[in-house]
Amino acid sequence: MSNSVLVFFVNGKKVTEVSPDPECTLLTFLREKLRLCGTKLGCAEGGCGACTVMVSRLDRRANKIRHLAVNACLTPVCSMHGCAVTTVEGIGSTKTRLHPVQERLAKAHGSQCGFCTPGIVMSMYALLRNAEQPSMRDLEVAFQGNLCRCTGYRPILEGYKTFTKEFACGMGEKCCKVSGKGCGTDAETDDKLFERSEFQPLDPSQEPIFPPELQLSDAFDSQSLIFSSDRVTWYRPTNLEELLQLKAKHPAAKLVVGNTEVGVEVKFKHFLYPHLINPTQVKELLEIKENQDGIYFGAAVSLMEIDALLRQRIEQLPESETRLFQCTVDMLHYFAGKQIRNVACLGGNIMTGSPISDMNPVLSAAGAQLEVASFVDGKLQKRSVHMGTGFFTGYRRNVIEAHEVLLGIHFRKTTPDQYIVAFKQARRRDDDIAIVNAAINVRFEEKSNIVAEISMAFGGMAPTTVLAPRTSQLMVGQEWSHQLVERVAESLCTELPLAASAPGGMIAYRRALVVSLFFKAYLAISLKLSKSGITSSDALPSEERSGAETFHTPVLKSAQLFERVCSDQPICDPIGRPKVHAAALKQATGEAIYTDDIPRMDGEVYLAFVLSTKPRAKITKLDASEALALDGVHQFFCYKDLTEHENEVGPVFHDEHVFAAGEVHCYGQIVGAIAADNKALAQRAARLVKVEYEELSPVIVTIEQAIEHKSYFPDYPRFVTKGNVEEALAQADHTFEGTCRMGGQEHFYLETHAALAVPRDSDELELFCSTQHPSEVQKLVAHVTALPAHRVVCRAKRLGGGFGGKESRGISVALPVALAAYRMGRPVRCMLDRDEDMLITGTRHPFLFKYKVGFTKEGLITACDIECYNNAGWSMDLSFSVLERAMFHFENCYRIPNVRVGGWVCKTNLPSNTAFRGFGGPQGMYAGEHIIRDVARIVGRDVVDVMRLNFYKTGDYTHYHQQLEHFPIERCLEDCLKQSRYDEKRQEIARFNRENRWRKRGMAVVPTKYGIAFGVMHLNQAGSLINIYGDGSVLLSHGGVEIGQGLNTKMIQCAARALGIPSELIHISETATDKVPNTSPTAASVGSDLNGMAVLDACEKLNKRLAPIKEALPGGTWKEWINKAYFDRVSLSATGFYAMPGIGYHPETNPNARTYSYYTNGVGVTVVEIDCLTGDHQVLSTDIVMDIGSSLNPAIDIGQIEGAFMQGYGLFTLEELMYSPQGMLYSRGPGMYKLPGFADIPGEFNVSLLTGAPNPRAVYSSKAVGEPPLFIGSSAFFAIKEAIAAAREDQGLSGDFPLEAPSTSARIRIACQDKFTELLEIPEPGSFTPWNIVP
């Protein structure tokens, strides 16, 4: 049969593709074939939602059009036949009309960098197409599959809450809509960041119609399809016989419905499946049949359809019949994200046979019956298969044979004496794979609590889902009681062992979870037995009952308070007003252009990297011949294409290489690069390059290993001292020695590193680069190409996030791309895939601190001797400066008269770690907060009282000899304690902890003091350029880069006030080295401080030139003045410059200067609740008070505070980097690396800006805001530690206990020692090789 023609619709337009590639995704097709670049590539594994589009199809079974949010990165374009695709461009634009979904997100300040915005817009749009007025729960579900690294999620939810049934203020009866006044406001403060009344209403009648051509005829559905390429053939049969014949002919063929598993295997494991079968038009696999015994679902029915029908039946049928249904929907809620559940099917989940499948334990415990069919000897054969013991025969294998097809699954109704419950524990609740899950199905003897039959299934404990038959048999005939729990716990520990080196790690935790999840099931079933009257109400102690519960996402409550602008401030003066991000509307419509959105150029090639697969080794052979033999592959680049000098690069020290030269120092180091016609071909060719190695030792991965081998960079350690530490420690009432440790953190900007290099005339090179430091890229590109800098221009219009990760590491991509473009004489492009980016570009520095502190019996700290170690990776990068800031911030807000702080930069065989928001400050302050809590614990005082006792006062000196001016930390503290109802909550928490054994709450107060300036003096400068045109419009250029932090918006505001004109007259096009030269990186939170003052400098020059004209025409307009100036030959272009004064401290050469220009302070109070049985936790509330001077833009600044808090929360609680003992990064995408999602924000999230605190040392009395709030996220960590301490007290354990950051569920559970953890035998460290280690 010849190739079929692919037909589908995109944004109402018919698309016909004659020879579609079965390996092509919908995302690739949209971006490269149709140039619809609003849909973004964020991860390629369906984990971030940046690629979300809406797919509409007519369900002819129900005669209903279904609108589904899907991940375009996983959706095969071949599966779109007969469908209608809607992208963000298709619902509205700034040139025509904004859709309310786009408008509300933008105007509610829900878009910062904007890279995730189109995906979030489309998730919401798809929801509204299915429910005109959704509930808040619908919103929660809709965004399970979307991530945002910038905003902290609050403003997105606030904007979209206006569409919901429950739309109302979170303050309930106290709402200002009821009382008539603002939430907590007074004459000085405001709380409205956006005006809801300005939103255009949603009018469903205006939505695009489903294409009539698809609706009127079933021709697209009834047609069997074949799409073939030279590697893969895609089949879409339309009846069961055709499907079974294909499977008989190609037994190894993969059946693809949602492509959520196969797509990941093909992309990341590089599997090649020559035959793919799409069975979505075979009615037998789509059937839903109901009878008195239960419901039968076809194997290809989507998980969302299953969920919806089961929820309906739960509402309609008696509870006793729907316990399996309820158990299923409970598990489905946490099964991936909605985009995945919309297309994934239960049959795929069963047949994939993942050992951590969420549904297989439920189906195995329930003994589900499966229907299977095959075509043998020309005949259709069917048989039934029982899911239970023996069904899974090995890793991803089961008893269903290769030529057979799973037709469907029976869900039986439960009986009155039957109970089935399931629990799942993951790193993060929403959209995460299980660490361990469990399902327990028990049937009791009639109207009793005597076990008649029980089946228990567990995931995450073996290569397959496993049952526990021996333990189950032990329970038969036994009374369901606490005595049974003890026996079961011991038996499960024996029956389900786990090797100390088992893949996945967390051995003790996983073994503890098996017992703990059973116990949660015991509690849940006991409560149901009690409720039904079978057991007495007091059979289960009241304090144990909450142990049966799981966390649920509450409806968000929030408040944002900021200083009201003066009533006499001109309306056109935007300073201090909550203005919308300048690019927010374009970001919400997909019109905003990022580096990889730039249209492909004639002759352009793609560059793909060959990466090291060894942590430390000599390269003995490098052979690209096989790769170069492929059609469309043009050239291979390696160290041989550069001189030794040209190949040596680095941001400060040239201790790195463009391409590894003779030796590799870590996994993921760039060895070479392949230039080819397109990305897929270049990456395939790169995998064909043969690299042979001679491995070297030792391989050093961890800080402890570096200390053991004395593997430090030259000139370290370094020390900073103040006073006499030895003497003070000797005289102290108390001394204490401690250690604390924290891991690294992946930046996870949604836009990965990208660069496009274009050769121009006269040996010029033009680079478009996702970098925070265009001048550094310019300088190093000139270095590797041996060009003068004036021949190289680097441009950065906007970045899809940066957080420091694009300050120095952008050279990893930009330099090879520039070299290839220069040598080949044609445009070259590269945008790293997420796994490449995470492997290559480094992370936040892990730190280890060892300290000895002396203090009085009242808790006044008198001395501290502290050692700081950071894990730099294999090259220096900026690690020396990160260490210095940690050493300068370790004391946080506390005055310590005698200090010795030493710092070591550890050299290891990891990718070079780099700048990350906070730049060592959060790590240093983390040590300081451990110290203050150690002191409080030892002297027996409340930690807040000890904080107050030790706080710096205005006029005090730090240990690096800077005097503190205008230091308002006490005011921040008192305001925050009041705002958070601290004293009242302490009592509530104490009461809760007394009443609950397996749930505990904790609360923590964390202050912060963050120094504002670059640590290297020469970087504290900025330039600007302002051009005024004849029509009065103003083009502003400055040296900062728009990363999403609102820098361009603030610069426009500054210029508008300085020039006295409306913001709408001012435009910023891009950051470019030919506009403003010799720029500093946009980092260190000083973007607004430096560039804002440079902008003012240029404005002042222009104002001076225009002053005589304004005097001559006092009643004139701006345009008239500019027109007059032009004809008077007055220059309407000016440059500005600013150098931060009074800084550059050095103890010998500049002892009277400051290290930092000033400090930004704040305080946060966070309350958490933990599940002591699983280690799960939930942030109940966070209150933050920040001193940011006179805010330039409260909406942007509060957005920065919330986003920084959530990033800090992730750093200290969720985000764990997983490395092999040899230094290979396991966590290379959102599947394993978990940053906070929508459901992780505090249930109550309040931010208040300190009023009446202008800062004289920055533009318009403002303060820096990007980095300072991040450390407040640690308040969740310290609150968790308080909650753990409460759990340990119930176990009779007192005193301190170790808890590393991040405080993952594993660490929380193991720290909550109890009768279950006591059953575990933990092997001694060193007696085995662990699966993973902490760097």
From Swiss-Prot:
Keywords: 2Fe-2S, FAD, Flavoprotein, Iron, Iron-sulfur, Metal-binding, Molybdenum, NAD, Oxidoreductase, Peroxisome. Substrate binds at residues 807, 885, 919. Gene3D superfamilies: 3.10.20.30, 3.30.465.10, [2Fe-2S]-binding domain, Aldehyde oxidase/xanthine dehydrogenase, a/b hammerhead, Aldehyde oxidase/xanthine dehydrogenase, molybdopterin binding domain, CO dehydrogenase flavoprotein, C-terminal domain, Uridine Diphospho-n-acetylenolpyruvylglucosamine Reductase, domain 2. It is an enzyme of class 1 (oxidoreductase). One of its GO terms (molecular function) is iron ion binding. [2Fe-2S] cluster 1 binds at residues 43, 48, 51, 73. It is found in: Peroxisome. Its main location: other. Its cofactor is FAD; Mo-molybdopterin; [2Fe-2S] cluster. Pfam families: Ald_Xan_dh_C, CO_deh_flav_C, FAD_binding_5, Fer2, Fer2_2, MoCoBD_1, MoCoBD_2. It catalyses: xanthine + NAD(+) + H2O = urate + NADH + H(+); hypoxanthine + NAD(+) + H2O = xanthine + NADH + H(+). Residues 4-91 form the 2Fe-2S ferredoxin-type domain. The active site is at 1267 (proton acceptor). [2Fe-2S] cluster 2 binds at residues 113, 116, 148, 150. Binds 1 Mo-molybdopterin (Mo-MPT) cofactor per subunit. The keyword Oxidoreductase applies. GO terms for biological process: arginine metabolic process; compound eye pigmentation; determination of adult lifespan; glycerophospholipid metabolic process; L-tryptophan metabolic process; purine nucleobase metabolic process; pyrimidine nucleobase metabolic process; xanthine catabolic process. Belongs to the xanthine dehydrogenase family. Homodimer. Key enzyme in purine degradation. Catalyzes the oxidation of hypoxanthine to xanthine. Catalyzes the oxidation of xanthine to uric acid. This is Xanthine dehydrogenase. It comes from Drosophila melanogaster. The gene is ry.
